[in-house]
């Protein structure tokens, strides 16, 4: 959403708000369309949406490694899966993630974006998304930053990997 719909100043525009949500598939197709346009290839959104995600990912091979060589659950997974797991169904998250990684690749003179480039920018990306969340919900939850930082796993939980397991059980 471009504006917070529950903000105290939105009563003047709430009748004009256009509700739109993205799927990760649409966001991946959007990235592929941008890459294809950069290389002078005209693909329509309709054409791209019809393709499977692995098929879409092949278009990205000219700008980033196809396999992300991370650790744990991210060990040798398709790069597009790593990207989709981080973007919260928000196109601007994907733009930010890819822009940071591309700048890192340029700085290190890499021909394409690699696992190393993504790993180098994850902390900056995460801090930015945390700040986005704080800014987005501050008017509704004034203490949102303390709440979010309080959810951070402890050192012991990190070592045991318990801090990253969330269930719906009470």
Locations of the language-model features?
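The catalytic "switch" region of P-loop NTPases
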Residues: 1-72, 115
